[in-house]
Each structure stands twice: as C-alpha cells, then as structure tokens.
Amino acid sequence: MFEYLYGTVEYKKMDYIAIDINGVGYRVYFPLREYEKIEVGNKYKLYIYNHIKEDTYKLIGFLDERDRKIFELLLKINGIGSSLALAVLSNFSYNKIIEIISKNDYTTLRQVPKLGEKKAQIIILDLKGKLKNLTYTEEETVSMDMLEDLVLALEGLGYNKKEIDKTLEKIDLNKFSSLEDAIKGILKNMRIGD
C-alpha cells in the first residue's frame, strides 16, 4: 500500500497521469478539477488511495490530503463507488464540500453528473456527523472564489490560460482584500515577468 508518491509527471491524460519515480512509471487517477494544476515535467507529492476491487487495482491521487480523506468517507457510503466519489471531488474542493454539507445544499451537490437527489441526500446525511472533526478554512474559500473571478477577468484582458496559471502559482491571493486589488497586483506581477 502506498501512502503517497513523489515524482515527476511524465504525461497526463484527461483522467490520469503517469508519474515517474526512480524510473518506474505509475498510473495515478485524479479528480478532473486538478487537471490544470498538474504540469508535465513538474514534481508533485500525491496522497494515494489504493483502490482494490476484485480484479482491479487503481492508484487514485490527490494534491491535498484532505481531499483523500473526503474521498475515503464518500466510499464508506452505501451505493457510492470510486467513480462517483471521484466525480464529487472533480466538481468541488474540500472547502466547498464542507460548505455544502454544513448548509444541507442538495441542489449544489446534485450538479455532479449521475448523482441524483436521493444519493445527494444520503451523502449529506451520512457525512454531516463525520465532518464535525474536519475544518473549514474561510480564507481558502475566499481565495477559490477570487481565483475563478480572476481567471475570467484576466482572460477577458487577453491573457491566455497558461500565462495566468503560471502567474497565479507565485501569488498568495489571501494578501489581497478585494478582487480589484488582486487584479492590480497580478497585472503588475505579469508585467514584471515580461
């Protein structure tokens, strides 16, 4: 069993990456939400869930250990398999899931493909008690919301996704008090980088 893998991403497909560790390539499936964050040639530490079922063995990786914890909790719910649990984490971050559960927000949770009303209710009811010990970080939620708005604003100004992602990796969004301040700070940083 693997706790985590640390290595270089050799290539990536839509639902998995090949990570090289000392000349051995591991196929690791991951939430689609993290696709843009993972770049070929970079090193990453992936927290691994070892999915073993009858004749199948899959490594499922997460950039954040808290995402793996939520994934494991989802798998313990009757009727939720690895594909559906991965779909939930492909649509929502750790903090967003905590928020959805705490607010009983079935409507938002049902945005996950193939997740009907009944399963959404079961997930919320089942996780409500289990998530008491998991923390919700307000700062990170603000940053995620701001991040989405920033990307849209910068794309509107003509910057491409690769330029934007490269710049955002270097910046702590929590230091900005508003979206306007963040845009100014990022544009200044992008001009310096030119």
From Swiss-Prot:
Keywords noted in UniProt: Cytoplasm, DNA damage, DNA recombination, DNA repair, DNA-binding
Residues spanning the signal sequence: none
Protein's cellular compartments: Cytoplasm
GO BP terms: DNA recombination; DNA repair; SOS response
Chain segments carrying region Domain II: 64-142
Annotated region described as Flexible linker, given as residue ranges: 143-147
Keyword DNA repair: yes
Disulfide bridge positions per record: none
One GO MF term attached to the UniProt entry: ATP binding
Principal place of residence: cytoplasm
InterPro entries: DNA_helicase_Holl-junc_RuvA_I, NA-bd_OB-fold, RuvA, RuvA_2-like, RuvA_C, RuvA_C_sf
A GO cellular component entry from the record: Holliday junction resolvase complex
Keyword Oxidoreductase: no
Region (Domain I): 1-63
Domain of life where this protein originates: Bacteria
Region feature (Domain III): 147-194
Protein family per UniProt: Belongs to the RuvA family.
Function: The RuvA-RuvB-RuvC complex processes Holliday junction (HJ) DNA during genetic recombination and DNA repair, while the RuvA-RuvB complex plays an important role in the rescue of blocked DNA replication forks via replication fork reversal (RFR). RuvA specifically binds to HJ cruciform DNA, conferring on it an open structure. The RuvB hexamer acts as an ATP-dependent pump, pulling dsDNA into and through the RuvAB complex. HJ branch migration allows RuvC to scan DNA until it finds its consensus sequence, where it cleaves and resolves the cruciform DNA.
Assembly notes: Homotetramer. Forms an RuvA(8)-RuvB(12)-Holliday junction (HJ) complex. HJ DNA is sandwiched between 2 RuvA tetramers; dsDNA enters through RuvA and exits via RuvB. An RuvB hexamer assembles on each DNA strand where it exits the tetramer. Each RuvB hexamer is contacted by two RuvA subunits (via domain III) on 2 adjacent RuvB subunits; this complex drives branch migration. In the full resolvosome a probable DNA-RuvA(4)-RuvB(12)-RuvC(2) complex forms which resolves the HJ.
Entry domain remark: Has three domains with a flexible linker between the domains II and III and assumes an 'L' shape. Domain III is highly mobile and contacts RuvB.
Protein name as it appears in the record: Holliday junction branch migration complex subunit RuvA
Protein's organism: Fusobacterium nucleatum subsp. nucleatum (strain ATCC 25586 / DSM 15643 / BCRC 10681 / CIP 101130 / JCM 8532 / KCTC 2640 / LMG 13131 / VPI 4355)
UniProt gene name: ruvA
